[in-house]
Each structure stands twice: as C-alpha cells, then as structure tokens.
C-alpha cells in the first residue's frame, strides 16, 4: 500500500507551496499474467484489472490526486503485446472489445464529477476481519456529506466476484434515500430501509455487500442529473456482475 508514502509526499510538497498538486503518473494494471513491466508475475484477469483501476482512481480521488490510467489500448512492443489497455487490441492494431476496466473508468469519471469532492477518510466500525477504506463524498457547493465510497484494501484485487455482506457504521453520515452503486458495471441498487438507519451521529448499514473494489453509498439526489434508477435491490452475488 503506497498510500502512507503518498500522503507523506503530499505533506512535504504542501510545506513548500500548497498550490502544487500531485499527479499519479503512469500507473496501470495488466489484464493477464505478464512476464515483463509493472505488476508482472501475478495472474491478473480482466475483472481483477477493473478492480485495481477502480481502487486506484478512488484512492487518488480521496487524496485529491489527479489520476492517470495506463493505458487506453494494449501497447505493441517488438517482443510482446501488452495487456494494460482499457481496450483489447490485436496485432493488427484493431480494437477487439472494451474490457470491464473501460466501463469502470467511465463510471468513475461520470460519478466523481466536479460537483462532488472528497471529504477524506471517515471514521467507521464494521464486523468484518477485512480492512476497509471508507472515504466521504460531499457536495462542492455547501460541503454537505452525501455519501461514502467503500472497499476492502488489505489484499491484491482478485477475480472472485462474490461480495461479503457486512455491518458497517459510518461516522457523520446521515442519508435520507441512499442507493448503492457498483462501479464496474455502474449498476445502481435500491437500499431497503432496514439496510441503513441513523443515530448517535452515525449511520449503520446491515447486510451491506462490499468487496475488494469500490462500492458507493450515495444520496439518490446526488446522482448525476438524468440518471435512471430502478428499485431492484442488490443480491450481493455474482448475478450482480453480469453486463
């Protein structure tokens, strides 16, 4: 986890000039096992790639860092064809299909638009042994806390598509009509009333499906204008992952 080092760098840079903004630079993830370049020797899949991209973008957004996702298409080297692309290409330099990571980036960019800003890490409690990141989402215009982005951060993203239902208490959050957004498919799910209730300055979610990729709890009114939602409730299973 490079986050502590990045935060230390941001603090150092701000001590010289707070106007300087950090940039993530060339960062990306393969979609298959690679024998060269970054993140090699690990059996990546197109789904674990999408999870990695979503986590990287969410973490950068939480810290106020501009993201650069490497790369848009698969690069062709003299000795190999890379798999880092959001678009799968062939040796004829033709686009074959859009990877799940392509849709993930679309959904992240569409949701985390300029009207919303990071509220940083939120204090939380949960009944899971997994380590979580919980970052607040607030409106730019008035600083109202309108949601949170949550993911398991203690392991390399896997290609397992199962969610873990947990109990989660988030400090300072109070939502009237929350929805749950899965950032790879972009699907928006209704959260029934028993899933979330507020009290003692925090909000509790019961049976909340989380995994090693960001899910977003958001006030319905904070969705992008024109977003169509359905009253389908998330099942917390692989059925939720089908495009």
Show where each model-derived region lies.
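Solvent-exposed beta-hairpin/edge-strand motifs
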Residues: 169-189
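Aromatic/acidic polysaccharide-binding cleft in carbohydrate-active enzymes
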Residues: 28-112, 116-131, 144
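C-terminal beta-strand-rich structural cap/linker in extracellular carbohydrate-active enzymes
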Residues: 192-243
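Well-ordered, non-membrane alpha-helical segments in soluble/globular domains
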Residues: 2-9, 45-54, 101-102, 162-168
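Carbohydrate-binding surface patches
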Residues: 124-175, 214, 218-223
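Active-site neighborhood of glycoside hydrolase catalytic domains
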Residues: 1-24, 30, 50-57, 63
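Beta-sheet entry/capping signal
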Residues: 20-22, 66-68, 147
